[in-house]
């Protein structure tokens, strides 16, 4: 949004894993950030973190993300969707927000702000472009419960030294990891979510 001179809270499109195809019905300035999905505009490669001008009927196509997971398509002025609780985001599980409270479908028409052409093209310092990879180091903090009453100390060492993969059942509300199974101090009882006593 900053690159386009938009309000920082202007609505855009978040693309997860794969991007789809979008046709402009008016002249509009846009930019793409996040994971590189090898976008093309009428077959011509579109650079990331660069303001591009699209003409009516031009087609913007995305492939899939080779590294990273989410790509962001922003348009000058933002996408015209209602704000709910101060946010333009879509909450698919709750069926509200964004465009009709759901993921985009073929044939959907998104309305842009009246002024959707950038007057001047801001530059973006390359040092601020995040390095996106498929392997990440994440931090771990103990929760409010007394950790050592639930988990064996040796498992905590395993937890912080192992590699995990993201489970396909993950979503915005929570990430499930595949990796070493917790080693519990007690065989039954307790309140931890994954504990064998919890059904």
Where are these regions (language model features)?
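Conserved "landmark" site that anchors the functional core of diverse proteins
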Residues: 1-199
